[in-house]
C-alpha cells in the first residue's frame, strides 16, 4: 500500500477541551462573507443603509442579500460537535477532500479579523463531514452539517422582497388606481393614530388584524426578476410603462420617510428579457436602485378596496 492511501489515524486529544469547532463569539460582528461551492463564488458585505436587508450581495451581482440564507449558513456552523481530530498532513488532506476543499468560507469581522473555513468530504455512511481552519494544523471530523451548503446557488442569496417596510413601521398607506390617462382614484387610504388604531380619512376605525392582513399582502410581494442589468433600450421601455402607472402606492413611515411604488399594467415585452406576453408587470420603488418584474399571479392584490378592510372581507 502506498503512503498516500494509508488509513488516517485520529489524534489523541482530550475532546472535553475541543467539544465544538467554533465559539459563539467567532461569528460576532461579521462585516464580510465570501462563500464558495461548486455552484459559484459569492461575496457579501454588511449593508450600511440596510434598506431591505442587513446584508448586500456584491458578487456576482450587486443586490440586497437574503437574510435567511446568511443566517442559515451561520447557524449551521455554530454548535458543530467534534467527533475526532486528525493531523493536517498530506495524507489526511487528500483522503478528506481538502485539496482543494469542496467548499470554502472566509469570514471577516468589523476589526478585520479573518477566519477561513474549509469543508471537505461528506461521508454518507457515518453521516459526518470534515472541516479545517486555515490557521490550524488539525482536521475535525464532525456531524454532517444540517443546512445543505453544497446546494446554495445565486438565487438563494438574492432578496426578492420588493417592499422594505414592516406593518409596525407604517404610519400611512395609500393605494391609487389610474382612471383614463391622467386621473386617479383612491382605493385605500388608511393611517395609524397615536393609539395605534387604523383609520381612514373620514375617521372610521378599522380592525387592526384586518388592516395588517391587507398591508402584509402588499409587503410580502416578491419579484420574479430584478431588472439590474439595464440597457438604454430597456430603460426607455421601463420608463414608458411606469411613467403613468396603472396603480401607485405611497407609504409614509413612522420615521418620516415617504416611499412611492409605481405599478404598471400587464406588459407585452421587454428588450432582452425572455417573458410570456401579458404575464408580468413592473414595480418601481423610489427607494430601490432597480425595478422589479412580477408575475401576474400577484396582480389581484391591487383590486383590494378600503371597504373590504372595514367589512373584514379580505
Identify what each model region corresponds to.
Residues 1-314:
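Secondary-structure "cap/kink" motif recognition
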Amino acid at each position: 500500500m502506498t503512503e498516500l492511501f494509508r488509513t488516517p489515524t485520529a489524534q489523541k486529544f482530550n475532546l472535553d477541551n475541543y467539544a465544538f469547532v467554533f465559539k459563539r463569539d467567532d461569528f460576532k460582528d461579521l462585516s464580510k462573507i465570501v462563500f464558495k461551492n461548486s455552484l459559484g463564488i459569492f461575496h457579501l458585505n454588511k449593508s450600511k443603509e440596510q434598506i431591505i436587508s442587513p446584508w448586500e450581495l456584491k458578487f456576482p451581482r450587486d443586490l440586497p442579500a437574503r437574510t435567511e440564507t446568511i443566517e442559515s449558513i451561520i447557524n449551521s456552523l455554530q454548535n458543530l460537535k467534534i467527533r475526532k481530530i486528525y493531523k493536517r498532513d498530506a495524507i489526511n488532506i487528500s483522503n478528506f477532500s481538502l485539496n482543494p476543499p469542496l467548499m470554502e468560507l472566509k469570514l471577516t469581522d468589523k476589526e478585520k479579523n479573518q477566519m477561513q473555513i474549509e469543508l471537505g468530504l461528506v461521508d454518507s455512511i457515518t453521516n459526518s463531514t470534515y472541516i479545517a481552519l486555515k490557521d490550524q494544523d488539525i482536521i475535525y471530523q464532525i456531524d454532517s452539517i444540517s443546512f445543505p451548503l453544497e446546494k446554495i446557488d445565486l438565487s438563494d442569496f438574492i432578496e426578492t422582497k420588493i417592499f422594505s417596510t414592516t406593518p409596525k413601521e407604517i404610519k400611512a398607506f395609500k393605494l391609487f388606481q389610474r382612471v383614463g390617462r391622467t386621473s386617479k382614484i383612491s382605493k385605500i387610504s388608511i393611517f395609524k393614530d397615536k393609539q395605534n388604531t387604523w383609520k381612514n380619512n373620514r375617521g372610521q376605525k378599522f380592525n387592526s388584524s384586518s388592516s395588517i392582513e391587507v398591508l402584509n399582502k402588499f409587503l410580502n410581494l416578491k419579484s420574479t426578476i430584478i431588472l439590474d442589468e439595464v440597457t438604454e433600450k430597456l430603460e426607455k421601455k421601463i420608463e414608458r410603462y411606469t411613467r403613468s402607472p396603472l396603480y401607485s402606492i405611497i407609504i409614509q413611515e413612522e420615521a418620516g420617510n415617504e416611499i412611492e411604488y409605481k405599478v404598471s399594467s400587464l406588459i407585452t415585452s421587454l428588450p432582452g428579457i425572455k417573458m410570456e406576453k401579458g404575464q408580468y408587470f413592473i414595480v418601481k420603488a423610489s427607494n430601490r436602485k432597480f425595478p422589479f418584474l412580477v408575475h401576474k399571479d400577484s396582480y389581484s392584490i391591487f383590486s383590494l378596496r378600503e371597504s373590504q378592510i372595514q367589512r373584514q372581507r379580505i
